[in-house]
Amino acid sequence: MSVFRDLVEGECSEPNALGNFVQHFTNERSYHDKFEDHGKNEFYDSLYRHEEEYNEQRHLDSIFDGEGQEDDIHLMMDRHLNLRDGPREHKELPLSNVESDLQFLFQDFINSTRAGQLFHPSSLNHLPLTFEDKSKIKNRSSIMLKHFSNGESEQFEEDQLNRMLDSLGIEVGDDFDQVWDSQPHHTTTTTTTTTTTTTGQYDQYQKYVNDLPEEYEDYEQHQQELFDDGDLEDYELDEEWDKGDDFHPYDSAWTESDRSVEAAWDETARRTISDITRPITQINDPKLKKSNFMKFMNQLNSGEASIVGSDVVHNPDFKRQEEYQQQADQWTEDYNDFHEHIPQHRIQEYQFSIQEARDSDTLERGMGLFNEGHLSDSIIALESEVKRNPENAMAWMYLGIAHAENDQDSQATTCLIKSLQIDPTNSKARLALAVSHTNDYQKERALDTLEEWLQRTPEYTALYKQFKGSVDPNSFLDTWSRHEFTTNLFIEAARSRPSNPDPEVQTALGLLYNMSYDYDKAVDCFKAALQNSPTDYQLWNKLGATLANSNRSQEALGAYFKALEHKPSYVRARSNLGISYLSLNMFQESATTFLGAIAIHPAPNIWDNLKMVFRLMNREDLVQKADLRDVNAFLDEFQFM
């Protein structure tokens, strides 16, 4: 079933490890959603586009128009692995999420096209794309599809393109040339100025649109000649395309996503060091301010020093490089000390939803509400508990888990870090933190946390030290090399228990393989974990989401049913189940499932999913009813209670 079977037994698979479990079921999510969530959003269209804050529009325009491209767009590639499922509650969407979502959307589009698999994007139709943005995306998508498709059918290419456009709220049938002609004035907003498009700009834009087919034909002919000569690699083809074409940062999203992963991470480090170091230099901690580490961060931020490859290079106008080299050990020590201070700094950022603790809201009440699926109420109760008892590590952990299930991973991360600060031995909290880091696009931190989990687990401490000892501490690993190292580390941990798999190790491996899109291997790992944790509802949901992300929605149904069997109030599994039904064109079942989820937790994104199903059913009357946000209004037609 999976190439992972070729590895030694006991890694992520063993005899009878739930191998064909889905055949027993006849019923039944960030980046690409949270890996716990179903990759469902190819169905979203422009009906649900939401207007963002004015500043976000300006920021997005600056990305497309070339301003600020040195600021943070490349940092986002390191910070945002798009594994989300469903439209975010983007009311407070950080500006930095916009370009990262586009980056990974383009990368997933290319990767899935190359693999000959249908695209499963997250919905980004809430982004405030301008008319020109949409036109460029549509044309560029068509070209890149032709470039990377490996002889797939026309139907596949059409479906693939439609899924890409739907995810951004771009109507497939839009005639941009005609619409443009009908608009006498076209205004482009940037971060610094607002200008009206001139006739010359229009002519240039019109020429760009009209010339694309011919340009692409010439490009493809030239490309074939180079291929025949055997002189051109994939990345060189993109460079040929880029010649003579002044790409905006949008276009760089295409080219960045098609370079080698290692080069992309190196470019990220090179171009965004100022953004990485600036917030560190602003930490108001007297001990850190006097440290050599903070001095080094200030030098990187000011340009006194820079990172080239794996070396630190200093400006010759400043102190000699040899002097700084002698301080390397001290910097390392200061950096470790910095990590000890970071948790307290982050916990100060936690945003409480209550002002005062309520006596009736205890840990027990919060846990009860959580188990019943009342996430918002459970969060309030758990906040009361940690306000009364700020050293209650268990309360902080469950508050973090509740936030994670409520799709609030930044808040979850803060709570879980606080829990681990109080009790570093809590392996459940550390593994949950790794998941939230992944969901919040913090890949490096997810890898750090997974390695910390292994290091702090007595059974694997010796293995961890042995592995770390084999790596040159002065060597530089880009993120994907680091990912490979961490994966191999957990593979060895899994091999140490061939006949009795550790479900936590297998879960970590499933997470790592989801990061690298190795869904078959991830499926094997989750199945092996379930053999020893058959009642873990979150694990069943992870399995279902991974199956769905690998275009196996029919199999995913069974996994979601098992998750709900063990926790009927698990809203995320209900939502994912509704999406799987939708993927299979089972609209009645999908609507019923979404209504059941809303009855437990009326999240706006689930209402949006429901309205989309009603539109696919051609039931505008139900769409209007859904706008009232009254779930009881559907009891006469749907049995969901």
Curated annotation (Swiss-Prot):
Family annotation (SMART domains): TPR
Keyword set, alphabetical order: Cytoplasm, Peroxisome, Protein transport, Repeat, Thioester bond, TPR repeat, Translocation, Transport, Ubl conjugation
Ranges for region Amphipathic helix 1 (AH1): 12-34
Cross-link (Glycyl cysteine thioester (Cys-Gly) (interchain with G-Cter in ubiquitin)): 12
Pfam families: TPR_16 (PF13432), TPR_17 (PF13431)
Residues covered by region (Amphipathic helix 4 (AH4)): 261-288
GO cellular component, one term: cytosol
Assembly description: Interacts (via WxxxF/Y and LVxEF motifs) with PEX14; promoting translocation through the PEX13-PEX14 docking complex. Interacts with PEX7, promoting peroxisomal import of proteins containing a C-terminal PTS2-type peroxisomal targeting signal.
Domain notes: The TPR repeats mediate interaction with proteins containing a C-terminal PTS1-type tripeptide peroxisomal targeting signal (SKL-type). The WxxxF/Y motifs mediate interaction with PEX14, promoting association with the PEX13-PEX14 docking complex.
The name this protein goes by in its record: Peroxisomal targeting signal 1 receptor
Species assigned in the record: Dictyostelium discoideum (Social amoeba)
